[in-house]
Every structure is written in C-alpha cells, then in structure tokens.
Amino acid sequence: MRYSNVQFIAWCIHTGPRKLGDGVEEYAGLSTESADIAARVELVARALDAARDCPETTRDDPETLKVFMLPEFFFRGSTGAYSMDGVQALVAALQSRVKDEARWAHWLFVFGSTVGKSFQTRPASFFERLFGPKYVIDTSKPIEAYNYVLVQKGGFTYASAGPEFAEAVLKRRQSGMDFILVSGGGGGIAGARVHYLPPTREYGTTSEVQVASYDGNSVFVRDQLTLGVEICLDHAAQRLKKASGLPPIDLQLVPSCGMTLKADSLVARSGGYAFNCDGYANYDTGVLGANSQVQGVDSGDVAVVAKASLDVTGVNVAALFARGAGEVRVYPALPLPKD
C-alpha cells in the first residue's frame, strides 16, 4: 500500500566499543554468542514497547508508516562480529519479534547494523588431516566480514514469511572506527585483520538498485516507497549520489556510528526525507553518546516531539553496551510525496 504519512522513531544508544584506557578498547557483549544475541533481541523488544507506548506515536494508524531505526553496530557481540550461524539465528529472532500483524503491520524496522564474519581456509597439512578436517582456518589471510542492515517490514503473521518482507543492505566502505585498533583481549577482532565483502552486482555496473532483496545494494521499493540506505561512511562518500540510474528516493536512511547527515550527500526527492540514527556521540553537546536527525528536503530540520526510556529489568545492559540503554526519540508524523 501507499502511505500518506511517515513517522520516524530513533533509538539513540551508544554502540561504540568500551574504552579501557591507553588506546585499548574492547567490544561490549556477553561471552557466549547465543546469549549475546538473545539479550540484544530482548532489549530491542523493550525499545519497541517504549516506542509503541509513547503517546506521540501514531501506533496503528494505517495511513502512517512508522520507521524505527537503530544505530550501526547494534549487533556484533564480544568478538566484534557474529558467526554465520549466529547471524542467521539473529535474523530469525528479530523477524519473530515483529511478525504480529495487530501490533506491527504499519511499521518498518531498520535494525541498526549487524557485523558477521567468516574465515578463509587452506588445505590442512598431513599431520593436521590425521586428527581433523581436510581444511583449516588460514590465519595468514584476513577475516572476511560484512556489515549489513536488515530492513524489515512488520506484521507478516507467520515467521516463515519474514524474508518476503525484508531487504539487506551491505556497507561498502570500511572506516577506521569499524573495528577496534588495539584489542583488550577476549578474542576481539582488530581492524587490521578484516576485509569487507562487497554487495553483489552485475559486472561493470554502478547501479545501487536491488535485483534481489538480499543482494546488498542500497535502493529498493517497499510499500510503493523508494528507499535508499547508506551505512555511516557510505553516506559521507556519497554512495547514493554517485550511483547511476538512481530513481527518485522518498526516504534516505542513514544508520551510523560516527556520522551526521551531509548536505552534499543528500539525494531524497522533493517532499522526501533523510533520517539518521547515530550510535557514537551527541554532537549537540560534543560528548560520547548517541544522536538522531530528520531533515525534510523542502522543510529542513524536524524537531523531536517526545523521548522515552526503556524498561530494562532483567537485561544486563551494562555488559551489552558501554553507555547504557539510551533513549527512544519520536518525531512527528510527516506528509509523504503524493506521487
């Protein structure tokens, strides 16, 4: 369906690493991957409840699309990246949380970003094969990592239908902030060991329009709205602006950890909007924290109308995030372009 209005909701939570001093950092998270994922998904559920319960949220209004965004790096765990199995389990868990049609039919979730990893292998030596597999991890080669955003429409009733209502966008450019530089131990991945995997695309093209919903490109259509997603540095590097054959963008979405909306990177059409949720700093006060922005192409900056805190009872937030559970910020419902 085509919506008449859009309402942006940002969960402003610090998603940067924990600083230990003398330039040493560590990723915040639980030591067991499955427990870490379960705890973060539970915290997401608490944030969604806070957003729905806010009086300024239009909740179930069928004419208004609610766009709920988390910052970059919300899902990465104590090593800095989840295993392939962990990423698949995470997607299934998130989709299960937002499948209820009565609660989430008119919501679109931009689930921050998830960092996953895989290891390159080499043939095992003769002695290694005597006691193990034919192929082993090649520690001389970089870890293959992907930093991607799951964009999920809610209200699809059956969990098995979740993939039909989802898109995945891969980050293209790795910044110096994406991984810790000096590890505090505990198996944390340092940036020098990482190589990002690129999105899939036809050879020789510079189009960013998705052909398949999980191909990693940044432009897609959902509910007759054209959305463009840029993750942090991709926005500053004008990923969308430099793409060929870019269709008119209704909503430009920028989840980040260390980025603000850049005037020379905006591509949303007249009547459209740009929305940023950042997990690194409060740029108004100049301190570590989190922030959000909404800008109308024709109307300029949009002010927050309400803020809400989370009920975090029973969730070990201190282990998951370096600076607490943050806050949910609600913006007013805004008119969408008519055509």
Residue ranges of model-derived segments:
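N-terminal, active-site-proximal structural segment of metallo-dependent hydrolase catalytic domains
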Residues: 1-77, 82
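Extracellular structured ligand-interaction cores
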Residues: 3-8, 106, 144-148, 217, ...
